[in-house]
Amino acid sequence: MTIALIYGGEGYEHSVSMLGFQHLFPILEKNYRVLPIFIDTHGEFWLKNKRVFPTYGGFADSDGEVYRVDCAFPLLHGDMGEDGVVQSALALGKIPFIGCTPTVGALCRDKFTVKAVAKSLGIPTLPARLISRDDEIALPCFIKPSGLGSSIGAGAARDEAELQFALENAFRYTDRVIIEPLLESKRELECGYFGVKGKELFTNAGEILSQGGFYDYDSKYGGSTKTATVADVSPKINEKIKEYSARLVAALGVRHISRIDFFLVGEDIYFNEINTMPGFTEESLYPRMLAEHGIGIPKMFEMLIGDIL
């Protein structure tokens, strides 16, 4: 069994994928022949020192040699990775892959659109609207790009100086920027989804134990933030989060894996975003939440590969 482990990526979360690759590769190569396909920041595919490109049933180099694979795992996050772009190339090459279809990946990548879907399903969300650089904005607020992950380009604004910085930072990445109320006191909860062969698991809620403030990129991947694999919440809150997650997954057409993020303010739950390719670093919460339900990484891949082949 040969699996292409695709990592890196052209987008802003390149380094996150690299960390996940370092964690996953030694685990996978115990059970599979792993073809490490690296995508550089220019969007070029590499197999070791050879440039390759997706072709029918595998990857080909410029000499015409084809490296066949049985399936692929696109360990890519955010723009140009989790948004259906690479998945489209795999689909065109008839390479079975783990994760969402290109259409679903593109849909789930846009926070504003997914919030509208959640609202239509009766799932509470924070009020959000798209803004331009010249809009009048009431303070305090929270500003973030609509199509990026890992909190890239996102920031709080409590005064005019912070507002100008947040706007400049967000619009550096995209013209599609959203504004939300600023929650000074909140808990950040996550629910993991795992689905194969018509059976679905929604994990108990986990929690990001941020030390106050904003859970930004450096906090997520700098090793300073603590997490709880099982959040200390009431059974009612836990079940409600799983219920909301199930509604979203069904409506959006998510398959295989995802992580659904929520805010908890007092007893009020607010949907935040969905990630169709959760992190797989050593610190990542998603694989640990699955492990709490008896699904470690080797078993996860065995079940996922069995679902697509």
Map each language-model feature to its residues:
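Phosphate-binding site of ATP-dependent enzymes
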Residues: 160-243, 264, 268-270
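Conserved metal-phosphate-binding beta-hairpin within the catalytic cores
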Residues: 249-282, 290
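Active-site "cap" helix and flanking loop/linker of ATP-utilizing ligase/carboxylase catalytic domains
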Residues: 207-258, 285-309
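Active-site nucleotide/adenylate-binding loops and adjacent lid/helix of ATP-dependent enzymes
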Residues: 1-7, 11, 22, 105-185, ...
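Glycine-rich phosphate/pyrophosphate-binding beta-alpha loops
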Residues: 78, 151, 211, 275-289
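ATP-binding N-terminal substructure of ATP-dependent carboxylate-amine bond-forming enzymes
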Residues: 1-103, 109, 113
